[in-house]
């Protein structure tokens, strides 16, 4: 508009159409690292001691499931793992006892205390799995049980008058026992792990590894890893859950070298070079359970108990349970389980059907 000339309506309208300049978005400030030594002691590091004291006072839950054909030493291995009779003895099994016609779920609870810390351990056994002539869909009762524990936890979680500490019966770890054939995995092995790895942390183990030579064991481990990779089966610890480079480096070594753990279990002690050791007596000598030159039991124990126990619990809660919870609430219109949109009762999420395996 020319200087000195009155502003017209057109000029005014055009000026209204011109957008005002947008303010620049605020740049988020990077967190500053402050050396507390300059300010005096604060006490942040005491949180670790606070957590330790609370854990010692309340204890913690750990629920482990064992799955595999009968005769693979599942009960013996779990007893060896926790150095307690936490599962029924293999020696107490009656040879005349009938094999269950269907898969059964048996949970046994124990309290183990070590160094002032109490662990409320539950061992879930699955007698009858894989022992039938027709093993079609024999994993469904196991998946149903796992989902039922998620359902129990969810109902307590959304309860208005919920308990201060919700009882945790969710399965944190599933040890899947592979028969030491030295050849390849059975279709049932592949179908079980492919299906159940989506709902629980599966750790594959080769049972009774002392029946194979070192060369046979190494080749079988490589073959199992290859078959799992080809079939798109991810076992714990899954790559996608690695939180940082340190986790990735540590877990890659486990995934590429240790898995599946070739183990031997025994609750019997023998004298070897003046020391009492857990082992199995064979015509060729004593197989020492905790000797890494003999088997990988010590690696499995360290992995499950000493380095990854807390992570097993966290992945169960943050990944598997949250997946179930989101699906359950989504199917229920966002309402608590048990109530539909019009007050109708909804059934629990059923086991997902999967391909036939014999």
UniProtKB/Swiss-Prot annotation:
Residues 58-331 form the Septin-type G domain. Phosphorylated by PKG on serine residues. Phosphorylated by PKG on Ser-91. Residues 125-128 are annotated as: G3 motif. The keyword DNA-binding does not apply. Residues 207-210 are annotated as: G4 motif. The modification Phosphoserine is found at residue 91. GTP binds at residues 68-75, 102, 208-216, 265, 280. GO terms for biological process: cytoskeleton-dependent cytokinesis; protein localization. Belongs to the TRAFAC class TrmE-Era-EngA-EngB-Septin-like GTPase superfamily. Septin GTPase family. PANTHER family: SEPTIN (PTHR18884). This is Neuronal-specific septin-3. It comes from Homo sapiens. The lineage of its organism: Eukaryota, Metazoa, Chordata, Craniata, Vertebrata.
